[in-house]
Amino acid sequence: MSKRNKELLEIGRDIGGDEAVEIIKALEKKGEATDEELAEITGIRVNTVRKILYALYDAKLADFRRVKDDETGWYYYYWHIETKRLPEIIRARKMQELEKLKKMLQEETSEVYYHCGNPDHPKLTFDEAFEYGFVCPICGEILHQYDNSAVIEELKKRIEELEIELGLRAPPKKEKKGKKSKKRSKKSKKK
């Protein structure tokens, strides 16, 4: 499966879950289909298929052509996947993710958090912990300052990766191993 196809399915899953993924796969395989045909192929209810198709259309990932049946006067909509704008859509989604991560980093670095140690319980800001007398409101354990340095480093790493992917930051330069050793060997010869 190509990276582009994986990204399309990922976006589809975000839009309409596993059912959207099935519809996208069916459309890719068939090329073009009506909502009724897709319902038959995937086993998903027609109303759900339509809802997902409209969501994909709104996201500019699907389009249709309308054909009028001259005998009945009814219109049939033949849907297909539209990938021309996929790179633009992926970039926009990555930009949104980047903004979200930067906001999270801002929150993590500007606030001191407290936690009881139970991973199922929330971490609290200083003000919240103070309000509860530095006692966990769920289990009653004493709240200790939460070391979020690993979270901060992970956020910084992901932000850097996204900025490099988006071309907003140059990738880190790798040092060449041979250059330093030549300089050292010249200095050692002079002695």
Curated annotation (Swiss-Prot):
One of its GO terms (molecular function) is DNA binding. GO terms for biological process: regulation of DNA-templated transcription; transcription initiation at RNA polymerase II promoter. Residues 170-191 are annotated as: Disordered. Residues 4-87 form the HTH TFE/IIEalpha-type domain. Keywords: DNA-binding, Transcription, Transcription regulation. Residues 174-191 have a biased composition (Basic residues). InterPro entries: TF_E_archaea (IPR016481), TFE (IPR039997), TFIIE/TFIIEa_HTH (IPR017919), TFIIE_asu (IPR002853), TFIIEa/SarR/Rpc3_HTH_dom (IPR024550), WH-like_DNA-bd_sf (IPR036388), WH_DNA-bd_sf (IPR036390). Belongs to the TFE family. The winged helix domain is involved in binding to DNA in the preinitiation complex. Transcription factor that plays a role in the activation of archaeal genes transcribed by RNA polymerase. Facilitates transcription initiation by enhancing TATA-box recognition by TATA-box-binding protein (Tbp), and transcription factor B (Tfb) and RNA polymerase recruitment. Not absolutely required for transcription in vitro, but particularly important in cases where Tbp or Tfb function is not optimal. It dynamically alters the nucleic acid-binding properties of RNA polymerases by stabilizing the initiation complex and destabilizing elongation complexes. This is Transcription factor E. It comes from Pyrococcus horikoshii (strain ATCC 700860 / DSM 12428 / JCM 9974 / NBRC 100139 / OT-3). The lineage of its organism: Archaea, Methanobacteriati, Methanobacteriota, Thermococci, Thermococcales.
